[in-house]
Amino acid sequence: MTSAPATSDTPFAIGDYTSAPLRLDMQVRFTNQSPATVFDVMGDPAQIQNWYVLAKDTVVDEQTAKDELQFEVDFILFGKVREEVLLWTPPQRYVYRAFGEHFPFKDYVALIEVEETAPNAGVLRWQQYFTEIEGEDNQRLHSVILPHLNEVSLQRLATLINGSDVSVVSHL
């Protein structure tokens, strides 16, 4: 995890982490929950299988440095996917990249952002960026099912963060 290149003096820009296009733009509104609590739930690798429908198991690496976080998620369909946190600025946002032998999304980078809109209320955003879905069969399959899988997963996440109004906009 790192806070570079964004600092308190410079605004955050996803372009500092990827040039891939936005493919999925998702959000969950939450109430009666602090942004820090929402961030803690979404940012905890051990909780991924509690809400993401394709996640079977998560193994977090021992941190090699104080500011690094890497872990591996075993997914139905994708197998083992490595996730590396590129930016960690709790409770506002984090950015991670994901890759794996059977992970069809090339140059995948995601942004998780929590915005407080009122005391103990706000919006959790999850944006997925990638250049392509590798393979014709994967393109046909994932362009149809990925938005729905993520929506179902965010509905499950909503139960953990007192969320509602799940929205998924696909650019696939």
Locate each region found by the language model.
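Hydrophobic ligand-binding cavity/cleft-lining segments
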Residues: 1-62
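A conserved amphipathic terminal alpha-helix motif
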Residues: 2-8, 129-172
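A generic structural micro-feature
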Residues: 18-20, 75-77, 102-106, 118-120
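Intrinsic-disorder/low-complexity, polar/charged segments enriched in Ser/Thr/Lys/Arg/Asp/Glu/Gln
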Residues: 21-27, 70, 80, 93, ...
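Hydrophobic/aromatic beta-strand elements that line small-molecule binding cavities or substrate pockets
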Residues: 26-28, 81-87, 98, 108-116, ...
